[in-house]
């Protein structure tokens, strides 16, 4: 099933890319465990990594610091490798409240979660691809270091069907039930099967648009065919098919029976300890909860919160690392850590927070001590499991630099010839008035401005001040959710307003070629918001515009400012020299505005949660100008229905696009009436 990686791109590597690709590939072939790619904003870091993957033909996992950047990378990799398996693995919770106990108020908070079915399907598809093929790129968030089902047990549970095999229909149904598939003859959806005479239709858990039909004749598999579950149309007939479990946490019956005995032993030992310490309430609570879980496991093969018994189910010893996505990656796999200066500290912090919450649950009799082993990886375990690694960042952290032995692969020259912004330092005393005049200059020539402040209060006051002086300004703060944030960024790019004020939200991975000025207020106040890395990242937001400029307002030049200015000037010098030698004139990026909202276009545009295929979206600017009022009214009614459908499918970006078009249509309707 595997194919060789085939890179699809109209561009050839240019600028610093060919040298970066050569050095990274040499390092990997020489067996270097750690390498760092220092790639400035807009230098094509993803393209460089895609070239390395295609040249070396190795399965790869790309770690991103959050879902938004993971979706952006997934979209880019999908374009680079349309014929290969590009998969997406992030947390499938839309909402997650872990179980917790607050001793001070004697409050127990039950686990409460809302699972996004579409992302669950993509996670299952990712592990299936990792087990079946070598031409796989999995883009994952830090969710990859959390416990997952053991790959060995997962493989043992698979159901293989081949044409001509002798198998009883009831045996197939029993095996499907063990894989946690549910029979549903009415609503045929992901993770279910239906039976009609000697025909069994199975909707694989990892698929979103293809189902399997098994036709039996007297205990023999006569035909296997793939069909569209929506239309029932046969797509192809196949000689064999493998059905994977519905969940990563599925376990063979004999392993469950063995695990139950081990759980009973631990329960007896723990009860003894609690009674010796006169903790009668905790002992009774633990006994009641564990006995209930054991009965559920005995009857159904699983229970709510079964992940708390994962140590027994995977057969691992106390304190051993849980099985994670890394266990599914082949031994010669490659790990790419994107925005490593953010991702690496995140990995280090996950274990400690999880541990503190679970210790309270164990102490007060809500969980057995073995629940502590259902956890994310410790940092040292992550280091031990990680294959050959490339850290990618515009501002690598000390950890990455130390691991790479100070030998950093530089990717400073952009293929477009764009230079790093010019930096100016100006006094704090007149910063607001000076900023106002700079904003007016930029707004007059249809360019945008980003302003970063130190405090929420200052951001609010500045926004109010700029509004009073007639500027079109918005404030981006931490209470805004991801989708709304993307809408604000899109509106900035479309020119709905000229200035965006924020605190710490203007750093990694924001693509805005229209921004020609970044203003950093109180740049001389040392701290994490004004550290060398933060300053370089923020300055980089203006690096996608030909007229890019950064103004740092400060009365003195701090060590962080000096380093950030020095590094930016070093890069600018190198870029200028390259441009002169090769006769390159810097060109602004002409990135379509919809691109930023198509972060994970392949995620949103696939079939949404079994509700039928998403309908194509009409571009907001394709509004017919010569429609009659009646036709406009009909069009508005149609689009309102489509907008609600997208919102229901959680495709908020598409819904927002239609909302903008509706706004234009309503204005036309009023004018025409």
From Swiss-Prot:
InterPro entries: Helicase/UvrB_N (IPR006935), Helicase_ATP-bd (IPR014001), Helicase_C-like (IPR001650), P-loop_NTPase (IPR027417), UVR_dom (IPR001943), UVR_dom_sf (IPR036876), UvrB (IPR004807), UvrB_inter (IPR041471). GO terms for biological process: nucleotide-excision repair; nucleotide-excision repair, DNA damage recognition; nucleotide-excision repair, preincision complex assembly; response to radiation; SOS response. ATP binds at residues 39-46. One of its GO terms (molecular function) is excinuclease ABC activity. Residues 26-415 form the Helicase ATP-binding domain. Keywords: ATP-binding, Cytoplasm, DNA damage, DNA excision, DNA repair, Excision nuclease, Nucleotide-binding, SOS response. Residues 431-597 form the Helicase C-terminal domain. The beta-hairpin motif is involved in DNA binding. Belongs to the UvrB family. GO terms for cellular component: cytoplasm; excinuclease repair complex. It comes from Escherichia coli (strain K12). This is UvrABC system protein B. Residues 633-668 form the UVR domain. Its main location: cytoplasm. According to PubMed:3515321, a cleaved form of the protein was observed that resulted from the removal of about 40 amino acids from the C-terminus of the protein. The exact cleavage site being unknown, it was proposed to be between Lys-630 and Ala-631. There was no indication that cleavage occured in vivo and therefore it is not known if it has any physiological significance. Changing residue 108 to A: Defective in DNA-unwinding activity.
């Amino acid at each position: 099933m595997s194919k060789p990686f085939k890179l699809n791109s109209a561009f050839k590597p240019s600028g610093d890319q060919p040298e970066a690709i050569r050095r990274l590939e040499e390092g990997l072939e020489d067996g270097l465990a750690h390498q760092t790619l220092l790639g400035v904003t807009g230098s094509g870091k993803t393209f460089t990594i895609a070239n390395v993957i295609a040249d070396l033909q190795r399965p790869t996992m790309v770690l991103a610091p959050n879902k938004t950047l993971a979706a952006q990378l997934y979209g880019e990799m999908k374009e680079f490798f349309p014929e290969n398996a590009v998969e997406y693995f992030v947390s499938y919770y839309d909402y997650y409240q872990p179980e917790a106990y607050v001793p001070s108020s004697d409050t127990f908070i039950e686990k409460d979660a809302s699972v996004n079915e579409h992302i669950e399907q993509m996670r299952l598809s990712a592990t299936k691809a990792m087990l079946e093929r070598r031409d796989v790129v999995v883009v994952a968030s830090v969710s990859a270091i959390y416990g997952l089902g053991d790959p060995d047990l997962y493989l043992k549970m698979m159901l293989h069907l081949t044409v001509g095999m002798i198998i009883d229909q009831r045996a197939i149904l029993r095996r499907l039930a063990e894989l946690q598939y549910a029979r549903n003859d009415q609503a045929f959806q992901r993770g279910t099967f239906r039976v009609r005479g000697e025909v069994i239709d199975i909707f694989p858990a990892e698929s979103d648009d293809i189902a399997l039909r098994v036709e039996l004749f007297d205990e023999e598999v006569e035909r296997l065919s793939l069909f569209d579950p929506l239309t029932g149309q046969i797509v192809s007939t196949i000689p064999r098919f493998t059905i994977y479990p519905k969940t990563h946490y599925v376990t063979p019956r004999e392993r469950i029976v063995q695990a139950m005995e081990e759980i009973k032993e631990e329960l007896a030992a723990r009860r003894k300890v609690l009674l010796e310490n006169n903790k009668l309430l905790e002992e009774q609570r633990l006994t009641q909860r564990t006995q209930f879980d054991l009965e559920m496991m005995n009857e159904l093969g699983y229970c709510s919160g079964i992940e708390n018994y994962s140590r027994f189910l995977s057969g691992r010893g106390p304190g051993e690392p849980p099985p994670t996505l890394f266990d599914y990656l082949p031994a010669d796999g490659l790990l790419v850590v994107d925005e490593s200066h953010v991702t690496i500290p995140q990995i280090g912090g996950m274990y400690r927070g999880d541990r503190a919450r679970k210790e309270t649950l164990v102490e007060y009799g809500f969980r057995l001590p073995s629940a502590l082993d259902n956890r994310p990886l410790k940092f040292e375990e992550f280091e031990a499991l990680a294959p050959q690694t490339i850290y990618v960042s515009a501002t690598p952290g000390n950890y990455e630099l130390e691991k790479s032995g100070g030998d950093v692969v530089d990717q400073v020259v952009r293929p477009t010839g764009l230079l790093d912004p010019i930096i100016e330092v100006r006094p704090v005393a007149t910063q607001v008035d000076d900023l106002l005049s700079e904003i007016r200059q930029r707004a007059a020539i249809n360019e945008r401005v980003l302003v970063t402040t130190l405090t929420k209060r200052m951001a609010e006051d500045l926004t109010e001040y700029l509004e009073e002086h007639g500027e079109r300004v918005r404030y981006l703060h931490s209470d805004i959710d991801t989708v709304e944030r993307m809408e604000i960024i899109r509106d900035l790019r479309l020119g709905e307003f000229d200035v965006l004020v924020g605190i710490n939200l203007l750093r990694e991975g924001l693509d805005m070629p229209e921004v020609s000025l970044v203003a950093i207020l109180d740049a001389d106040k040392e701290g994490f918001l004004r550290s060398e890395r933060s300053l370089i990242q923020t300055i980089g937001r203006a690096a996608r515009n030909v007229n890019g400029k950064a103004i740092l307002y400060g009365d003195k030049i701090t060590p962080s400012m000096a380093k950030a200015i020095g590094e930016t000037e070093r890069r600018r010098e190198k870029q200028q020299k390259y441009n002169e030698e090769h006769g390159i004139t810097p060109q602004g990026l002409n990135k379509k505005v919809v691109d930023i909202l198509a972060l994970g276009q392949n995620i949103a545009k696939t079939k949404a949660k079994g509700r039928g295929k998403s309908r194509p979206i009409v571009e907001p600017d394709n509004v017919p100008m010569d429609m009659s009022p009646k036709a406009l009214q009909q069009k508005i009614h149609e689009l309102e229905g489509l907008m609600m459908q997208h919102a229901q499918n959680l495709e908020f970006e598409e819904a927002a696009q239609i909302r903008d078009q509706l706004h234009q249509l309503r204005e036309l309707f009023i004018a025409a009436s």
